[in-house]
Structure formats: C-alpha cells, structure tokens
Amino acid sequence: MGAGVIPFAVDEGEVQFLFQKTFSGRKVGYLIDFGGGLGEAEDYRATAVREFVEETETMYLADDLGVACRSEERVRRQIAHVEELFERTLSVHPHWWCRRDPGTPENPKDWRTYFIEFPFRDISALNNEWKSDTDGRFKKRRELVWIPAHKLLELYSRSPGDLWKRVRQLE
C-alpha cells in the first residue's frame, strides 16, 4: 500500500505538472511522482504529503534554500504547509486522485495518487542545491522537472516508457 502526489501549478496561463528524476537506483531515467509506502498509522493522504516533503528535502516551500534539509523538525513544519495545499485543493475537488492499476489478482497494487495545486516555483535553484551538494546534506540527488500538460499527454500516448511504472499505470 502506498500513495503519492503529482503537483501541478498554473504558470502564465499554462498548467504544468511537477516530476522528479533521480541519478541512482532503479528509477534512473524516468519521470517520477513523489510517493512511497504508507507509514505506521498513516492514511493515503498523509503518506502523499510526507513523501513530497521528504523527497524534495524540504526545499520546495523553503524561503531559504541554504538551511533546507531533511531534519525531523523541518519535515514536520513543511508537512503542515503541504497539508494546507492538499486541503485547499481537495475541499473543492475531492476526486482529484486516482488509483494505480492493481495488476495481478494474486498480488494487487494498492496505490493512490493525488493531483494537488502547488504554488509555481522556479526550480533551477533547487536543482542547483542538489547538484552542488558535496557534504551529504541531502539524502539523494534529484532533479525536479516541470512538464506542461500537453507534453504530459504526449508522453502518455507516445512514450509511456519515459514515465515511472506507477505513473504510467494510473487508471
């Protein structure tokens, strides 16, 4: 069981979706959502919120990128902000989530992905922080990527292999 989020924002009248890329591990080369397994006593929504904060290493909503890190205190504070974004979106659009194709009946996947509006942010400074990290401040190097809605639709129809499996398996 797990959950994730694909944030979106409107920038200059264009809807864009936020994905991440990694540089090591089994997800290299894919566009990936922000998600993972349910934590102890977590529901889907709480998991998606926490995973976004952890996987962006608290940088996305940080005012000062120089102090962003994945400490318990910073994660806890950012979770409150991301919960507000979820509430703002889902209170108006409660069905802006979908399930992952469960796959085989013997081992069905139980996954929920939310589509939540976030404030648009230029991500180049965040990507530079990850790229220039030499002292291990961050857990894993990532790169954030904004994908315009029309390009995401093209990926689904023409190049679904560029999307991480749980993204391309959304129902």
Predicted regions and their residues:
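Acidic, metal-coordinating catalytic segment for phosphate/diphosphate chemistry
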Residues: 1-6, 10-12
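Residue-level detector of short, conserved catalytic/binding motifs and their immediate flanks
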Residues: 3-5, 44, 112, 142
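Nudix hydrolase/Nudix homology domain
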Residues: 25-30, 87-171
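Conserved Nudix-box catalytic region and its N-terminal flanking loop in Nudix hydrolases
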Residues: 13-71
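N-terminal functional modules and adjacent low-complexity/disordered segments of proteins
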Residues: 14, 18, 80-81, 85, ...
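Short, hydrophobic/aromatic-rich beta-strand segments within well-structured domains
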Residues: 6-8, 18-20, 115
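A short coil-to-beta-strand element that immediately follows conserved catalytic motifs
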Residues: 60-98
